[in-house]
Amino acid sequence: MTKIAWQNTKHIVVLGLGKTGVSVLRYLQHKRQQDQKLAEVKIQVFDSRENPPGLEEAKQILGDAELINRHWELEDTLAADLIIASPGIDLREDPVVLARDADIPIVGDVELFAQESKLPIVAVTGSNGKSTVTRMVEFVAKQCGKNVAAAGNIGVPVLDLLLQEQHPDAVILELSSFQLESVSSLKLKAAALMNISADHMDRYCTLDEYVKAKQRIFTHAKTWILNRQQQDTWPHPVTGKLMTFGNDSHPKHFGLLSGNIDRVSGPVAVTFDGSVVLRADQLQLQGIHNLVNVQAALALCQAIDIDIEAAVRAVKEFKGLPHRCELVSDNEGVLWVNDSKATNIGATAAAVEGLRPMINGRLLLIAGGVGKGADFRELQSTLERVDILLTIGEDGPRIGQLFNGSRQVKSLQQAVELAASLVQTGDMVLLSPACASFDQFQNFEHRGDSFRHAVEALYVNSA
């Protein structure tokens, strides 16, 4: 899109409060203070929630008069010169679509940031792994002496970076498909698309529509970092410098070397340019899928001028993120792994495929929750690598019907207790739900914490 003509903007409509919406208000307040001509601009905020997150701060910035506690109508959007939408807002709604048809600019916070920032930026998107990769790049960069910031769908809201007195040396953005829908000016040193699996099918009509939203990350990217195992998700043509990663070997790009370690066959090392740069046993992360995440992270580090050898030294110390294949207990020879962040089929498939080769015993999977319109038949081949399946939540029965002998239980607590009665030395219990959590929990963190507490209680009570 063309650059926003702030001097011609008299009326701004903000759709949605929350963390993003409040950061937009802070940004607009700052612009008003910097440019007296903007002091008279009318700003209205719409949010249909009775008590949306950030309401009190929004009142302090804007006052009560222009905080409107209802859903926006066509007359609201058509009255604006500029519409700023939070990521959760469906841009296919009639009041938004008709405003766009009337040539009213519709942007998100990332587009506002892109139009103003002159910082070096790399970005990550994908159905799964993007948070781990973002934090991994941030960790490595800081270990190598760079002042960097992680922002976007993780860390601080992007617009807050523009308000800081000291700007970082570089920015690492995690971007969701929702955020990318309204981005068109983001210039990146490198962009990575980790993977695509069916997700948010309650928002997108087709998988192709979801893929196209993800591919927008490459619009102005110099280096394109892409997954060799998912070439059907690559944008065509590839117009940037190509760097690939994958779970196979490659003579020039990043890849995996297979072999045998501790009696388990499979990938044992990360390679680059035909040489081993990192052994699997040097990492503190669980699962083969994390060896793939490391490859993408190293490629992004190269784009912000971090030497590969220095990056490899640093990444060995990265401990991973909570609720992502997190080992919460190794007790009596049984491993309990919290992968509550697995809110879609692809994430659960990655966890099972990544962890299965690392155990000598049986794999017991706990799955279920809110499926968000997913077709769970895509999980069928993954479930063939599972020995015992316990299901929970609203869509648990839909997963359970794919597995002979599965058992549906009422709660996660009951699932943990039942799992404890079934496992033996050498087994792993994996919570990887393939579903959202909001039928029984506040969020995936709440679900993961509940799993951890239930597991801890098992061994406290047996001590």
From Swiss-Prot:
The keyword Transmembrane helix does not apply. Gene3D superfamilies: Mur ligase, C-terminal domain, Mur-like, catalytic domain, NAD(P)-binding Rossmann-like Domain. ATP binds at residues 126-132. It is found in: Cytoplasm. It holds the Pfam family Mur_ligase_C. Pathway: Cell wall biogenesis; peptidoglycan biosynthesis. It catalyses: UDP-N-acetyl-alpha-D-muramoyl-L-alanine + D-glutamate + ATP = UDP-N-acetyl-alpha-D-muramoyl-L-alanyl-D-glutamate + ADP + phosphate + H(+). It comes from the Bacteria. Its EC number is 6.3.2.9. InterPro entries: Mur-like_cat_sf (IPR036565), Mur_ligase_C (IPR004101), Mur_ligase_C_dom_sf (IPR036615), Mur_ligase_cen (IPR013221), MurD (IPR005762). Keywords: ATP-binding, Cell cycle, Cell division, Cell shape, Cell wall biogenesis/degradation, Cytoplasm, Ligase, Nucleotide-binding, Peptidoglycan synthesis. Belongs to the MurCDEF family. Cell wall formation. Catalyzes the addition of glutamate to the nucleotide precursor UDP-N-acetylmuramoyl-L-alanine (UMA). This is UDP-N-acetylmuramoylalanine--D-glutamate ligase. It comes from Idiomarina loihiensis (strain ATCC BAA-735 / DSM 15497 / L2-TR).
